Design a protein with these regions (language model features):
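C-terminal motif of bacterial Sec signal peptides marking the signal peptidase cleavage site
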Residues: 17-20
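Extended ligand-binding regions for polar small-molecule ligands
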Residues: 22-23, 68-77, 137, 150, ...
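Acidic, polar ligand-binding/catalytic clefts
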Residues: 72, 81-145, 216, 221-222
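Short helices/loops that flank or line small-molecule/ion binding pockets
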Residues: 76-77, 85-86, 90-103, 117-119, ...
């Protein structure tokens, strides 16, 4: 009977071990609820890293810009690290949905179409789409002046969305040429490969400040005025609300205004 007593004791030890493992698994799985923002985890920011002054690579190769400074300050107040990840901007919705990035924070216009695929923060800056021409060009004065012209813009931008849905650009404009980023479009404009660029005023005027002798702006809005916001995955309401709270605090205490003054010379935030 000795062997029976040993077997019973061994089984008892095994059962205790299994019970302990089950309790540990229960405790681990219960530590993160649905909709959690994973406090402590780094926030991964998806961006187009050639979109000055909102987010771009500086001369030292580091990502910098207005939105970068905002994101760093927001993460600091949340007690979290922040990681900036350059993505193909035309695939931004897929990057967000897949979880490869937590937020889209890089001069992202709030549109009804995008609201179908993501949550947005409150708007924090207005943004017009305007026309940019080569220095000395005087025949292009407004949208209708683009008839018969080759017009450049960035793929997956608000400008592209507007022109794709506008019959004038489909029928009367000679060609709408699409680029991976606005900087490439401006370079082609400088070199005479296209006649005009339709794009974000904030980005274009920043580029103009560095190339004042080559690019000019036609100070007329093309399409409706839009607003910038931060994009979040549809199922990440918790992170959206946490970030919105610190943004509200940054507005109230003047931090957002100071960051704006650093990049634009004045406070242009909403």
């Amino acid at each position: 009977m000795k062997w029976q007593r040993l077997l019973a004791a061994g089984l008892a030890v095994m059962m205790m071990g299994l019970a302990g493992c089950g309790s540990q698994q229960q405790a681990t799985s219960g530590s993160s609820g649905s909709g959690s923002s994973s406090v402590g985890k780094a926030i991964v920011v998806g961006l187009d890293d050639n979109f000055p002054p909102m987010g771009f690579k500086g001369e030292d190769g580091q990502i910098t810009g207005f939105d970068i400074d905002l994101a760093k300050e927001a993460a600091k107040r949340l007690g979290r690290e922040v990681e900036f990840k350059a993505i193909d901007w035309s695939s931004k919705e897929a990057e967000l949905k897949s979880g490869r990035v937590d937020v889209l924070w890089n001069g992202l216009d709030i549109t009804e179409k995008r609201k179908e695929n993501m949550l947005f923060s409150d708007p924090y800056m207005d943004n017009r789409q305007i026309i940019f021409v080569k220095k000395g060009e005087t025949s292009i004065k407004d949208e209708k002046s683009l008839a018969g012209k080759v017009v450049g813009t960035q793929s997956a931008s608000t400008s592209e969305e507007y022109m794709d849905g506008n019959e004038f650009f489909k029928k009367d404009v000679k060609e709408v040429k699409k680029y991976s980023d606005f900087v490439s479009a401006f370079m082609d404009l400088e070199n005479g490969r296209i006649d005009a660029v339709v794009g974000d005023e904030i980005v274009g005027r920043y580029y103009m400040s560095k190339h004042a002798d080559k690019i000019d702006a036609v100070d007329v809005a093309v399409g409706p005025v839009s607003t910038f916001g931060i994009g979040f995955a549809k199922d990440n309401q918790a992170l959206r609300d946490e970030v919105q709270k610190v943004l509200n605090d940054m507005k109230a205490d003047g931090t957002m205004g100071k960051i704006s003054e650093k990049w634009f010379g004045k406070n242009i935030t909403k």
